[in-house]
Structures are given as C-alpha cells and as structure tokens.
Amino acid sequence: MTEQNGQENESNKTLALNLSGRPDVAGALKAGVRVIPVEIEDQMKEAYLDYAMSVIVGRALPDVRDGLKPVHRRVLHAMNERAWRSDRPYVKSAKIVGEVIGNYHPHGDSAVYETMVRMAQTFSMRETLIDGQGNFGSVDGDNAAAYRYTEARLTKLAEELLKDIEKNTVSFSPNFDDTRQQPDVLPANFPNILVNGSTGIAVGMATNIPPHNLKEAVNAVIALIQNPDITLPELMKILPGPDFPTGGTIIGGEGLYQAYATGKGSIRIRSKVDIIENNKGREIIVIHEIPYQVNKKNMLEKIGDLVNEKIIEGISEILDLSDRKGIRVEIHVKKDANAQVILNQLFKLTQLQVSYGITMLAILDNRPKIFSLKEILKSYAEHRREVVVKRTEFDLDKAQKRAHILEGLRIALENIDEVIRIIRASKDVREAQSSLMATFSLSELQADAILEMRLQRLTSLEVQKIIDELEQVRILIADLEDILSKPDRVKSIICDELGKVSQSFGNTRTTEISLESLESSTFNAEDLIADEEVVVQLSEDMFIKRLPMDTFRRQKRGGKGVQGISTKREDFVKKLSSAMTHDNLMLFSNKGRAFLLKVYELPIATKEARGKSLKAVINLNDDEIITSLFTFRNFDESYLLMVTREGFVKKIQLDEFTNTKKSGIIAIGLRDGDELIDVIANPNNYDVFIGSKNGLAIRMNLNELRSQGRTASGVTAMKLEDDDSIAGITKVEPNTNLFCISENGFGKRTDFEEFSTKGRGGKGMTYLKIGEKNGRAVGISSVKEEDELLVITQSGMAIRVEVKTISMVGRSAMGVKVVNTKDEDFVKDFAVVRESDSDSAES
C-alpha cells in the first residue's frame, strides 16, 4: 500500500511539472486532491463507446422480445398505467405526451409525439398500437396536427402487448428520477418485432425489419414451438415474406430467403398497377398501391418533372384521385404512346418501384445482434415461455395464499362456537389473535382473516360458498403446479393464446409476393423503349438514323414521294431497311467486317435531319464504308449469305456473330480488289437468287454451298463481265415473286418459276431488260402480294407503295414506273415492309 501511494505521489509530482500552465490542476494537487492522469485517446475511446452503447441499447434499436424501442415502450406503459385503453374515452395527446415526459422519458416533446403519431398511422404500422382521433398525417407526407388538437388511446391489440404486466411477468427498473418503476420489456402476447417491424439508425449500425402479417407471424411461432427443428423453407411456406401496410408487390425471392437465413438481404417493392382503357379507347395507368414508406406526393412530383423534362414521353395527364377509401392515381397515356413502356420507365426512374434493404438487427441481453428469421422466432418463443411461467408462478402464489386464508376460515366455521368464545374472552385483538393461533394451529394471516370476517358469513349459504371456493382454489393450485412441472403444457398455453390473438386481430395479406428474381425486376433498355416499326436509313457519307414507319405515307405507283433525308449537296441516301426498335442491326462494311448494335441505339430523327455520323456509333476505319445492313430479332442456327462485288458467295451460320460488338469483327476474307456488297439471312435453306447490275441472275440451291468460318472468302457464284457487278442477293421464299427496280424508277415483279435452279459458276440468265430509259439494276428482293415497298432516291426523296400495284411481267421486261425521278436523280435503294415478319425485310 505504501509502495502504491509512493507511485501516485511520484505521478502527481510529474503531472505538476507538466501542467505548469494549468493553475487549476496545480492548485488541486497542492490541496491534496487525488488526480489520475489518463491518455486522451483512451478517454475518448471509452466515452464514445459508452455513448454508442447508450444509443444502441437505450434509444435506436428494438428489443427482439417485444419489438419496441424504449420510447415506444414508455408511451404504451404510461397510457396503460393511466388506463387510457380502448374501452375508455379518447385522451388529449398533449396529456399523454406530458405524462410520458414527466414520468418516463425526459426528452423533447416532439420525439414523444412523433412516436405516438407513427404508432397511430395505418400506412406506417401493419397493426396500429395507438388509436388516434384527428389528423395524424398522411401518405403524402403531411404532418400530424399539433398535440393540442389530437386525441388518442390504446388499441385493443396494444393491450395484448401489455397483458399480464401486473403479474410480475417482466422485469422493471427505476425511471430517470427513481420515483417510478418502468418495464424493461413488455409481455408481448404476439410477435410485434415481426408484425410491425422496426427502423432505426444507431452508432455504426442500423436496423430495418419489415412488417409482417399477424396471422402468418403467429403461425410461424406456433410451428417453431411445435417443431424446433423446422427448416427455413418450411417456415417460409407459413411466413412467405413481409406484409406492408401499403400493400404493393415484393420482388426478389433470393434476397428474401437470404434475409431470413442470415438477417440481411434486399428485395424490391413494386406498386400495384393496372392498365385500363377509357371510353375513348385511350390507355390509363391506374396506381392502387405504392411501396412502403414512399411519399406519394413526392413520387407524383417526380413523375411530373420527368414528363416536363421529356425524359418520359407519352403522358398527357396525371390525376390523384386518392381518398379515405384508398389510393388511386391515374396516369393518362397519349393516343400513340405505349402504356407498358411508360410503366416500365416509371418503375425504373421513380419510386413506383423501390429497393428495400432488410437488416434484422435487434437487442438481446443488452447486446445488438443480427437475427435470422428462425432466431427471432426462437427468441420470442423463449420470452413467451418466461412470461407464461412467471405468470403461472404469480397465479400459483396468489392461489396458495387464498387457499391458506380459506382453510383458516373453514376451521373457524367448523368451530364457530369456540371461536366466538375465545374472541369474547379476549381483552383485545392481539390476545384474540394469539388465542386463535394457539387453539387451532392457525397462522397470523388466518387469525387476522377470522377476526375480520363479518357476521353475515356465518349463514349456512356463506359457509358453503367458502367451502366451494376452497375446493375450486385447490383445483386451480393443482392445475398451476401441473403447468409448471410440464414444459409441454407451457408450450400448449403459448400456442393457444397466440391462436386467440390471431383469430381476434388477424387479417388477410395485403402485399403480394412475386416469384421474379431481382434481376428480372431490373429494367434494361428494351423494357423502356416501345417495340415499334421504324425505317433505318444510311447515307453515302455514313450518317445513320431511324424514323417512324408512318413518316412515309402510302402513295400510288408513280408518285414523286416525300423528302426522306436532308443531305448536303454531295451526300446521298445509300441504304434503307425496315425494322423493329428491339431488333438487332448487323452492319457489314466493304472491307468484310461486321458490326452489331440495337436499332433503338440509333438516333431518332426527322425526315429532314441527317442523323448521326456512323463513326460516332461504330468503329469504322477511314477507308471503310457500310455496304449492307439487315435486321433480325434473335441469334439462331440460320445461315447468312454474303455476296461480293466480283460475284463470290459465302454461307455462314448467324450464331458465328454472337460476340460481334460495335468495334467490329471479320465477317469474310476478301480477295484483292473485291468488296462485300450484300448480306441476307436464310433461316429455311431456300434457293438463292443473285442478280447483277446488268440484269443477269443465277438461281442456286443452298445445299451447293457448304458453311464456312468467318475468315473464309467464299466461292464463285456467277461469272461477270468486266463492266458488270453484283446488284444484290435474295432468297426464293414460297408465295413470293422477284421484285427488282432500276436506277430511273422502273420496277417489276416476276414469278420465280421463270428461273430454273442451276449450279453456281455460270453467267446467268436475264431477269431485267436494261437500257437508257430505265438504267441499270439497283437491287432485288423477294416480295409478297401484301407487302409494301419503301423506295428512296439519291437526293433523299422517298415513296411508299403497295407491292400489289406493281405489275407481274416476264423476266425480259423493263417494268413499269414505280417512282418518278427528277433530272439527275435516281433510285438509290429500297426496303420491303412486311408486317407479318419484319425480320425478313431486305434491301
């Protein structure tokens, strides 16, 4: 001890030397005050940890047993203490707030009132614990009225949380000023931690436990009690997922399973929406339910902003028709807009669909812990076991005390004359008490009960009542002792009581659970873009764009057309193709490279606009141009046919290009001086028809060609004269005819039967008579009677005509005028518009 004091004195001397600038400390040392030097880092660490644990345990996180934070528990206990229950009149909220602050929660009144308000909001709590009267806020984020205006009382369900609290079922601790006792936890006759969930941010941790359906939560507890080895999949058949007060649809089965298995996971909550038609045939998106904790007003304002900023197009009007009966928001869709696409955009860009992270963090034994679903159920079941046991012990003690009194009264009544004699002979109460105890071997309590007994109890009827009551109490005692000796009876009582709560207060599930995965609920670009028919247009200077198909109105054969592209003086239309916006667009260059992108990735432009430079979209080299393009929906095992300017043809499977990117890959190995001219898809192995610009063609069977790899250069299709080159390639489909068009706008249809199938390598036969009047062939394609043609000239004029208006003539004919070309203008390309199969459109 002397050695220790010596060390402290030495320490104080050192401290005095180091604190010459602190006269207060130096003075304390001189006065003999004990000063203990500490490291500031250690002190800050200890103080912060103390504060953190105070926040974690005493403020921000719920107790796993009753699902309540301290402030919620204090509010409910204060209201119960003052008997402000469901069978009593409403009480001013100000009075409740004052009671809680004055006796249990010495903090700001706003914190207490906000707690009250939340427990009364039907859109915040799955099962409200406070019955509020007045304005308690709204799903639009409106604040509740001041507490001087509102009134409240406990709900019947809240009373189930407090039931049996007077029977020593839970522990109590002193309040802040040691004037009252407050419960450390409530008896909780239902699993409130699951039913109403909890949200809170502590120091370094946070909890977000979703609410659940009361019936399902109760059934899950019962199932666990009856089968402690129950598996999580079995539990999830009973309790499939959260049940939010605002309804909606839960998406993310994997995330939900993960949350229940580990205590942490993520789901998505989607609004419940219908798409209906009004009397005018216009589509309306009707929102009935929104995700949990979403502010409806803010959500609608966000939608309005997206519409005003033209991020979402196609919405004409937004109406909020919500009332006391529920939510109803109508989003009116414009005539030509796609309601499903708009809805997908709303899901992606607004809180019509939200991500909800689950962290089931709660307090157990004064320590924070992340619970799995099964652990929560076990903790609650153990809590209820303790409550039932303590309640039974309390009732047993009370019954035993009552039996003890009744036994004394029975003895007195059986010896009433002697009792009266003893009492009359006694000088005072104490002597009478002692005499009775000595004569009949009674306890002090029994003697006092006899002395306090009224004379009316001496009637024969009252005597029998005492005897009957004693018998009933003895039966009760035996039953209570049996409960305490048999754990199975305790389990049975817990299950029975839970079942009664479920039967009295349970209701149907409001939130649907979708089997979609989280990945399937995320929206890719295609979900947000309408799958519409468009025209893909490419100019000589490699500017590309897409236009709505209805940009080009139908005209009679021989019309002048409409302006289809605004070009510079030296820029002209090169290629044209019809497509759907969700199609894949494969581009092939003269150098034999292939590029892949989606049609919707092309810029939308007007008829007059040039579009976007293709070099800004794909990786084209300076000496490289696109000579062919075609669209298709999906990669499959069908074949592509490629034809070069010098008459070589190559067959290759489409799925060889699945890894094609915008950077490009080799599609064909070209011979010196040759270029790739055209590419088509031939999924059904039809005969192939290849035509030259000088009007010669060859028809061959596809089986003559073997499939080759991407780097192969192909084989000879037809022998060409020096001044000739390939105009195009098409497939001979059933119920189709050959269509060809020449530079000066003459076109015709010819029956494929006029062309016999021959082997490759020949010079070909005439399919179009060419001359100065009609010019050389521009391109060929197979067409059906119901198809339409979109023809465009070098200057950008476009005409859309029906195939059936074009005459069927022989293979040596020149054809009829399809489009009237002006001086120095000529047909550059055409596209087939086929409603039934846009994928097969060729140019």
Curated annotation (Swiss-Prot):
InterPro entries: GyrA, GyrA/parC_rep, Gyrase/topoIV_suA_C, Topo_IIA-like_dom_sf, Topo_IIA_A/C_ab, Topo_IIA_A_a_sf, Topo_IIA_dom_A, Type_II_DNA_Topoisomerases
Protein's cellular compartments: Cytoplasm
GO MF term (any one): DNA negative supercoiling activity
Catalytic activity: ATP-dependent breakage, passage and rejoining of double-stranded DNA
Domain of life, per lineage: Bacteria
A Pfam match: DNA_gyraseA_C
Entry EC no(s): 5.6.2.2
This protein's GO CC annotations: chromosome; cytoplasm; DNA topoisomerase type II (double strand cut, ATP-hydrolyzing) complex
Sequence ranges assigned to domain Topo IIA-type catalytic in this UniProt record: 61-528
GO biological process per UniProt: DNA topological change; DNA-templated DNA replication
Positions of short motif GyrA-box: 555-561
Keyword Cell cycle attached: no
Active-site residues per Swiss-Prot or TrEMBL entry: 149 (o-(5'-phospho-dna)-tyrosine intermediate)
Annotated keywords: ATP-binding, Cytoplasm, DNA-binding, Isomerase, Nucleotide-binding, Topoisomerase
Keyword Membrane: no
Function: A type II topoisomerase that negatively supercoils closed circular double-stranded (ds) DNA in an ATP-dependent manner to modulate DNA topology and maintain chromosomes in an underwound state. Negative supercoiling favors strand separation, and DNA replication, transcription, recombination and repair, all of which involve strand separation. Also able to catalyze the interconversion of other topological isomers of dsDNA rings, including catenanes and knotted rings. Type II topoisomerases break and join 2 DNA strands simultaneously in an ATP-dependent manner.
Note: Few gyrases are as efficient as E.coli at forming negative supercoils. Not all organisms have 2 type II topoisomerases; in organisms with a single type II topoisomerase this enzyme also has to decatenate newly replicated chromosomes.
Family: Belongs to the type II topoisomerase GyrA/ParC subunit family.
Assembly description: Heterotetramer, composed of two GyrA and two GyrB chains. In the heterotetramer, GyrA contains the active site tyrosine that forms a transient covalent intermediate with DNA, while GyrB binds cofactors and catalyzes ATP hydrolysis.
Protein name: DNA gyrase subunit A
Organism field: Leptospira biflexa serovar Patoc (strain Patoc 1 / Ames)
Gene from which this protein is expressed: gyrA
